[in-house]
Every structure is written in structure tokens, then in C-alpha cells.
């Protein structure tokens, strides 16, 4: 077998090559309760003002501000309560001279009133109360349209539908939502050394951990996943299963077979399915031999057989492809700064991605490498919630240095932030 020439390219260029391809999924309509994590296919425009009416943000009394002028500790002013309303109710009374309506949070301001006095700002009697300070016009009132006005774009095309977006959609009565269909993913683990999870271990064999991991990563994104039987190192059967996967799925992910060994057939498979190879080497560790190809609007990802390298390849390259296919506004991995809490002394000729544990505190983010960090390591992945990105050409980093991290999980907040 002829060894294919590989020229490494930077990580950013690799991602750019992926998202430069013309690949998009169609728009579909889904029920609101099924829309979480989908990408909006159109702008959502406010069809009415929010709030729809002047309302009280507090429990208290609605008054005319003019009647409160001159109030002080030495000159308490008295008001008579003429009505009592809760949220969802509207008073039919007109608030007059030194009159007030007892009002609950969210209720519409009654006619004639233009300020709200909170309960704790009053001394209440049976049908009256007194105040000791003046109130200005519109004080303690949420005004009609102060949050959004009719015609405002409240959610943008390409935005991910999160729980907050679902609240907005529900507010405007969207029982159904137009979204971009999420791509389906085929997962094919390759390697004659692989055993299924329930197989008895044999000498020279390992269980297939990459397949279940990639399936979980894809399902976490809300993608439909097709799991294929573990493939032996055989070119003909490899070509056949990839062709079958391409017929049924929008993305095909293989793990293993991307290196330069005697049984690494992925380049031949890509030739057989007439796929254009976008790149076959990236200037990074782990996962330098990650290979990505493109054919008929579909992506083919050849991820490393090493678990850590496989995980890194999915986070860096598969995720942006999925977002691109769905028309997301943001496709590149989001990077934040963190303080390294332990030395990492290994030299980095290429950009290195380290599995790590990040903690977000009120003082900023800190990060600690997550145990054993070789590309074949498995256990470190389970204890990591981010990847530290160390630039190439460095000779290691000391504790206290500021580094870039990519969060891969959402459990980085310290308990103190919740107290």
C-alpha cells in the first residue's frame, strides 16, 4: 500500500475548510416542545408589545403621583383604597384624588394611576394607608413595550433554540416552529483489534470505546445516530459499509484507519466513494491524522482510533460541520481564558489540546489538567469538562499562566456561584 503524502495545516484553517463547503439541511416545522437545540430557520418578530400594558412589578398600591408630592416623615399623606386586583385582573375604577388600588405583581395599572407604592413603603390601616415620601410619574411601573415593541426581531435566524428561546416562542404563541433539520450521523468503528462491549477480552484486543463515545456526543447535540457493526481492517468491506452509510446519512464518522500503517485503508475508501479530501493532517496533538472529506453535500470524518484524539476531533471538527449544515450563526468553537493551576511541562511543536477540569468562579476561570494525557487515554476524558489549547512552539506552561480553553461540558461552575 502506497503511503499518502500528508501536509499538516493549522486547526483554524482545517475548520475553515469544513465550513466553506456548500452543505445545508432543509427547513422543517416541529412542535415547540420538540424544538430544543434546533436552529431557527427564520427570524422571529414580536407580534405585540411586551409588556402589552403598563403593569406593576411589585405588590403595592397604584396611586396618582401628584397626590404624593410633599410627603415626608413629618408630613405623612393618606390614601383611600378603592379596589383590589391581582395579576390577570383589570380594575374598572378610575383612581381619583388621594385614592389608590391595592395591586399585585403583574397586574395592569388602573386608569388614573401613574405610580406604584410598594407595601413596605406604607403604613396600612383598614381601608387606608399613609406614605412618607413623594413618588414620580411612572415610578415602580413596567411600561408598555419597554422590553420589546411590535416588529422587533426577538430571535434571529441561525440562533440555537435554548430554554430561554422556547419561553420567547411560547410568549408569542408559536405552537410550531420553523427550524433547520438536524443531520443524521453514521458511526463506524474500524479495527481488527476491536471487541464489542459485551465480548470477553482476548490477548491483543481492546473493547470498542470510540463508537459508543461518538454516538453519545452526537446524541448530545440532538442528532439522529445510526450505529454500524464494528468493521475489521478489510478494504472491500470498508468501502461497502461507507457507501451504505452515505446513502442513509448526512454525516459519516469512522474511527480508526486514518494513520499510515499497513492496515489503514481510509484514503482508499475515500477514493472509492469519489470524495474530495479537505485535509488529512492537522498541526495539532492529539489527532494530527484526522482526515475530513466531502462528497455530494455530505461530510466524511476519519477520526483517530485513539480515544482522546477521537474525542478532540469530534469537538473541533464535527461540531462546526453540524452547526454549518444547520445555518448556525456561530460555528467555530468558543474560547475563554483561564488560569492554569498546575505546571504542564511537555514541549509543544504543534498546537496541543489537553483534557482538563475547569472551574468558573467569581474571580474568573481556573483549569487543571485531567490526569493521564496521552492520545490513547480513556479515563481522563470522563473527568474533563474542557480542553486546554496550548499553542505550538511552546516549551510548556507554568502554573499561573493564562491559557485558552474550550468548554465541552456545562458543569464548570463552583458551588459558591450558586449561593
At which residue positions do the language-model features occur?
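Solvent-exposed alpha-helices and their adjacent loops that cap or buttress functional pockets
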Residues: 54-56, 71-74, 92-96, 109-111, ...
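Generic structural signal for well-ordered, non-membrane alpha-helical segments
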Residues: 7, 11-15, 28, 32, ...
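Helix-rich terminal scaffold detector
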Residues: 3-11, 175-303, 307-313
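Structural signal for hydrophobic packing residues in well-ordered secondary-structure cores
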Residues: 19-26, 43, 109, 155-158, ...
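Short, glycine/charged-enriched hinge/interface segments at domain edges or termini
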Residues: 2-5, 9-11, 17, 61-232, ...
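Short, hydrophobic/aliphatic alpha-helical segments
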Residues: 36-49, 90-102, 292-293, 297
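Flexible glycine/proline-rich
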Residues: 28-33, 42, 88, 148, ...
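Short, low-complexity N-terminal leaders and the immediately following helix N-cap/first helix
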Residues: 1-75, 328-355, 416-419
